[in-house]
Amino acid sequence: PSFKRGVHYPTALVQIATLERCYLFRLTHVGLPVEIAEIFANPNIRKVGLAFKDDINGLRRRRDFKPANCVDLQAIVCKYGIMELGLQKIFAIIFGKKISKAQQLTNWENSHLTAEQARYASTDAWATLSIYLALQKVKPLSKKAVESLKRAEKEAQIQRQMEAMEKKVKGENEKAKGEEI
């Protein structure tokens, strides 16, 4: 990952998961193989990701292809009443379990993946697929219900900000009173 605005490193790893297996493809030394680009371009194969647009753009910088049948979980979870956008939080909401994100900010371009990196990458891909399949089993909320949830979430966020500001002002006032004495 890059921690500087506008700086992009080439995509170093592609994860392709089924419920039983996850395949990790290191792209650092070989680029994007034609066969993997063909999977992403195949309209008969659904691809699911989280913040998928950036991932697809990164892959397209390695080899041009026209993506087809790609689903971004961040674009659909709100239709199911989930306002969180991070994989760990979405997974916890749906399954009531926590997944580790300890290796998220790691160097995927290392010459060898550690066991922890491979486990993280595999879990990440499997969790994304599991969330998508779980959502397919339930009916999405109506547009009106989604809008209502978004408004409620925004109001709750404003309320939390107001409470934080009040707490800060109260602390500053108490500190000022203490200095007067």
Task: Describe these PLM feature segments.
Residues 3-120, 126-134:
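Conserved DEDDh/DEDDy metal-dependent 3′-5′ exonuclease domain
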Residues 127-181:
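Acidic two-metal-ion nuclease catalytic site recognized across multiple nuclease folds
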